[in-house]
């Protein structure tokens, strides 16, 4: 039985997220697969990561890229077989890498056996596995909309009922009020733990306690009661790393999710910092420039509130987000500098860092000429909706370039060979044309690459407990160009100092710290005086005080 979260292995760990469809194809069908991941484990071992978060590989109609699961205990054939999955667990274990499964417990696919049964009649034993409301066709139970647009209710004429779906119409919500549903889910999780899973990322977990009649979707009244039961019945029976995805989390709520007593999760994914370059009250497509002062205050708040009372996840990229080097950096002239600066800013903080595939290469957003080249359901829906509202196509495309989930889903760039070494066949989605100069082969041959910088950052975290335990203090809070902070424990005080601009900036802090030891910096040669060059980052430490 695991007792609390005090000195857990995952506090020192670095996690690497794989989106299997776009990572590595092994059989030439143009779709990344599990054997492809196995073939690249040595690359990940070299990077230095401890765990892989694997986006869903369960059997699925792929209406929402595998987040619509039709069988939790089978593997989607395009990714491989259960034998492949077992081999992945075994091969990763040999290299000291754990596999975190991506769990979707809020909804299933409408092709899941439970839902097919549930639709047969109101008396079917599976009917109450989902959320139904009586009604008349065309008169919705209420005006709630789904996350992907359109009503959150779908009419089933045979039953004279609507079912509730917070996401796509092919993703009916599970009824967590039903203890049978919860038991089925717990048994499935225990089955995966037995197979060799080392942890779980819980998709939209803050939505499970919804109360549609009250229009409550996230943080419903029974949420934490359900989560404590989930943890008690499953994760606490093994040494799992668990992270809950909670778009609506505040630091106070996150304390509950990541309570050091281990009663819910190891940590939470919060998105407050990720929303700062979006117009307030508007959609994610309505972008504004990042205000660095706001970013600093936001991250400092999370660092300080969760210090000794919870645990942070540190991330800037995932399969839903645009590439950070294009978003908050400079993906042209200063691509390497800004990619490594952003990494330094993040990895110096307290929490468990997550690296999304290709982030360690400084992979960038993509700009396809036509909407026809895009795949993502959310992007295509938005294009259609905004055209109808009278937006100009060029204007909509600019939003897509900045924000589409497809930015993260172009195939991994392994080499300068055709299709970036991702596949010998026709890729399911086009590779970013810049693969000829941004790729893993090139990075591994250049000792000053983004890859080796990440490797160094990871090693620093492993060797210096101040990264795990040090107290955070934000410096220069009102400075619009420099993000600087210290981390301090009983033996070490370290300064993380980064320049968020493409200009030279003078930073008086560097005069005060000039006697310290430089642990890492993202320029090859030393600075002059207290000047930070464009997107420069440095970590300086005093030890043994």
Give the location of each predicted region.
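Active-site and adjacent substrate-binding regions of carbohydrate-active enzymes
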Residues: 2-545
């Amino acid at each position: 039985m695991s007792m609390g979260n005090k000195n857990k292995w995952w506090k020192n760990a670095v996690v690497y997220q794989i989106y299997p469809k776009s990572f590595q194809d092994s059989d030439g069908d143009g779709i990344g697969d599990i054997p492809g991941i196995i073939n690249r484990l040595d690359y990940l071992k070299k990077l230095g990561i401890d765990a892989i978060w694997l986006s869903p590989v369960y059997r699925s109609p792929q209406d929402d890229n595998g987040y619509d699961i039709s069988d939790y205990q089978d593997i989607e054939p395009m990714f491989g077989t259960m034998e492949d999955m077992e081999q992945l667990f075994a091969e990763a274990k040999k290299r000291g890498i754990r596999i975190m499964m991506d769990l979707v417990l809020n909804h299933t696919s409408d092709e899941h056996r439970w839902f097919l049964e549930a639709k047969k009649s109101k008396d079917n034993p599976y009917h109450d596995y989902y959320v139904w409301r009586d009604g008349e066709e065309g008169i919705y139970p209420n005006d709630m909309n789904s996350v992907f647009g359109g009503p959150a209710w779908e009419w089933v004429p045979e039953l004279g009922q609507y079912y509730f779906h917070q996401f796509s119409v092919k993703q009916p919500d599970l009824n967590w009020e039903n203890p049978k549903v919860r038991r089925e889910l717990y048994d499935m999780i225990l089955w995966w733990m037995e197979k060799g899973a080392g942890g779980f990322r819980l998709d939209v977990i803050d939505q499970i306690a919804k109360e549609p009649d009250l229009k409550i979707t996230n943080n419903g009244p029974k949420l934490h009661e359900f989560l404590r039961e989930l943890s008690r019945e499953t994760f606490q029976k093994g040494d799992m790393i668990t992270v809950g995805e909670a778009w609506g989390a505040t630091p106070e709520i996150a304390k509950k999710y990541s309570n050091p007593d281990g009663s819910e999760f190891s940590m939470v994914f919060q998105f407050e910092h990720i929303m700062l370059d979006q117009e307030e009250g508007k959609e994610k497509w309505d972008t504004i420039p990042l205000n660095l002062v706001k970013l600093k205050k936001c991250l400092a708040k999370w660092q300080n509130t969760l210090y000794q009372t919870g645990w942070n996840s540190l991330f800037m990229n995932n399969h839903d987000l645009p590439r950070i080097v294009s978003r908050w950096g400079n993906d042209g002239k200063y691509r390497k500098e800004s990619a490594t600066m952003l990494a330094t800013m993040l990895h110096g903080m307290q929490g468990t860092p997550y690296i999304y595939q290709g982030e360690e290469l400084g992979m960038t957003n993509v700009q396809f000429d036509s909407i026809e080249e895009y795949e993502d359901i959310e992007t295509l829906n938005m294009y259609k909706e905004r055209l109808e509202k009278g937006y100009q196509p060029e204007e909509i495309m600019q939003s897509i370039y900045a924000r589409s989930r497809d930015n993260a889903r172009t195939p991994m760039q392994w080499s300068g060979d055709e299709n970036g070494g991702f596949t010998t066949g026709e890729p399911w989605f086009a590779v970013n044309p810049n693969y000829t100069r941004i790729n893993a082969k090139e990075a591994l041959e250049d000792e000053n690459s983004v890859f080796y910088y990440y490797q160094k950052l990871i090693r620093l975290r492993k060797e210096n407990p101040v990264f795990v335990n040090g107290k955070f203090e934000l410096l220069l809070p009102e400075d619009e160009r420099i993000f600087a902070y210290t981390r301090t424990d009983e033996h070490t005080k370290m300064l993380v100092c980064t320049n968020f601009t493409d200009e030279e900036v003078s930073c008086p802090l560097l005069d005060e710290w000039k006697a310290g030891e430089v642990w890492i910096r993202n320029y090859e040669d030393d600075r002059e005086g207290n000047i930070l060059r464009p997107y420069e980052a440095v970590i300086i430490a005093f030890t043994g005080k």
